Amino acid sequence: MGWFWADGNASAAAPVVPPSHKDLAASGAVPPPSCPMHNKTMDALSAHKPVTPAPEPTPAAAAPSKCPVNHGAKDTLAAAAAAVAPKQPQPENHQPAAASEPSFFSKLNPLNYMFSSISQEPAPNQAIALPTERDPSSIPKGTGDGNWEYPSPQQMYNALLRKGYTDTDITAVESMVAVHNFLNEGAWNEIVEWERRFGKGLMRGWEIMKRGEENAPMMLRRLEAQENDPEPQPTLIRFQGRPKDMTPKAALLQVLGRINSKYATEPPFDRHDWYVSRDENGQKKEVRYVIDFYSAPPEPTGEPVFYLDVRPAVTVTGACERLLRWGGDVWWKASGGEVRERERSK
């Protein structure tokens, strides 16, 4: 997941109908490591052999008539000093060749750690032509200049090749792009729901959540009608894919699954951190959301099934929001709120 680009030099894409999500497949892999550094310092030092001082002559071997000053010591010390003295700075053409080449990470977009520019040209020896149209997302940029765009199938394929996935099935790329776009749209819809409930503060969030999750949509609509104040829309500042970093919640679920098979679940196949701009009482605030992507057994018709666990990161405010939403729902049910609601409606 996470293949957004917002470069202006990319081909513009008109709004199009989202592609079909049937018979979709997604996969993830780990990009290859960056180029190794070249270390020539030790080779340069090892070219000089250490100078072994000459053994001092014993008194018996010394001629009594010879001058006591060793006239050869001067030459020996000079040679030793030349061997260990630091060399003068070399011209710049002696710099390691790797220093003149851009590093792997310098080629990535700092907003999302993806390639900042991906060609729309077919790859060498590409047997099948791929579409170059890019679909716009419904996710507004934090910069305020429109929405994020999804990569075209050709860009996705080129990016996979640049990351080292040379065995990618080119016939599955369009389905991969459709799955990617579908999941990111679902993740953003979940974030918007969190922002609608807690974007104006914890007290308002509690008013919405105090009657459980089932009544929250009704409470939210009632509050919005009373306030008659348009809700500021959140925007996505940046995001980061972190497939190797398991979240604490996902790790806890894995531990519970080892204790009791009832809680056993496959680990998430991907993790994202999305940084969202929240308008809180006229002040811009950056809020981090954590997203775990889970796959599930396919539908009987063969369609793939995915689960997204979207929630605020465990900060002071984020932890309170999670407690109010999930804890409030548990309390409403455990305290008999559902029963009281049914009795009142009779």
Swiss-Prot record:
This is Holocytochrome-c synthase. Belongs to the cytochrome c-type heme lyase family. One of its GO terms (molecular function) is metal ion binding. It is found in: Mitochondrion inner membrane. It comes from Neurospora crassa (strain ATCC 24698 / 74-OR23-1A / CBS 708.71 / DSM 1257 / FGSC 987). It holds the Pfam family Cyto_heme_lyase. HRM repeats lie at residues 34-39, 66-71. One of its GO terms (cellular component) is mitochondrial intermembrane space. It catalyses: holo-[cytochrome c] = apo-[cytochrome c] + heme b. Keywords: Heme, Iron, Lyase, Membrane, Metal-binding, Mitochondrion, Mitochondrion inner membrane, Repeat. InterPro entries: Holocyt_c/c1_synthase. Residues 1-68, 81-100 are annotated as: Disordered. Lyase that catalyzes the covalent linking of the heme group to the cytochrome C apoprotein to produce the mature functional cytochrome. Its main location: mitochondrion. It is an enzyme of class 4 (lyase). Its EC number is 4.4.1.17. The keyword tRNA processing does not apply.
